Amino acid sequence: MDINSLLNIAAAAAKDAGTHLASFHNTRVDKEDGHDIKLRADKEAERVILDRLIPTGITILSEECGLLPAGDSNYYWIVDPLDGSLNYLRELPMCCVSIALWQGEESPVFGVIYDFNHDKLYKGIVGKSATCNGALIHVSTTTEKSKSIITTGFPVYMSHDEEGLARFIRILQDYKKVRLFGSAAMSCAMVAQGSVETYHERNIAWWDVAAGVAITIAAGGRADIEILDKERHLLDVFLSNSIITKD
């Protein structure tokens, strides 16, 4: 398996989808369900990506179409064609295309995130390096939680009852500042490039963070991942600069 060739395919797919999203701002809402929202744009971006990925013969898991089995290898394309759909709908410039290659459910190989609003392409191969538009990026060197920024969010499947919110607040209290960007993938990219020290979300979907996890690890960071619901692909994810700890 030629990882560099596959990375180039993923990067081209992300750029194609992002260019489409940036140039054709179709904001038709196909479905709203509680705290979730689906746009026609998600499906159109996914179609653009699948045209690139299907010929590779690797199984695809995408937020919109679900699982597309291919072959018998243990590799997966993990795709979120538009992460930050509500931001996109409201013209808040914090959304992106996210594509990752994983081996099984526990081993990220590489990730690609395209921030099409700012024309920034993040790439990272685990065990090698991470870049943004070709320039090397690295996680922060901050050593104290009290001087650190954590980014998080309110995932679709998060419990919004009193106990769930209290647990959420307890996690944040030790940090200097909290940022909610409305895009899990972009939050991960912020950790990878050293803009923030940590990212933590519970009940976040695999496709939301798969690329960001790979890029953060490639940039010198650490990922602590717990599978919460295998059928729905829900995780507890804590990314850090490898210095700041979860507890």
Feature locations, PLM:
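Short loop->beta-strand "edge-of-pocket" segments that line small-molecule binding or catalytic clefts
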Residues: I137-S159, L172-F181
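DPxDG-like acidic metal-binding loop motif
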Residues: G71-T131
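Short, Asp-centered acidic motifs that coordinate Mg2+ and/or phosphate
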Residues: T59, F110, I149, E197-T198
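Oxyanion/phosphate-interacting regions
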Residues: M1-A14, G18-T19, A166-Q173, M186-D247
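Short glycine/threonine-rich catalytic loop with a Thr-x-Gly-x-Asp
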Residues: Y88-E91, V178-A184, I204-A205
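A structural micro-motif at secondary-structure boundaries
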Residues: C132-L136
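N-terminal subdomain of lithium-sensitive/metallo-dependent phosphomonoesterases centered on the IMPase/IPPase/PAP
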Residues: M1-L82
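Residue-level signal for inorganic ion chemistry
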Residues: A17, L21, D42, L53, ...
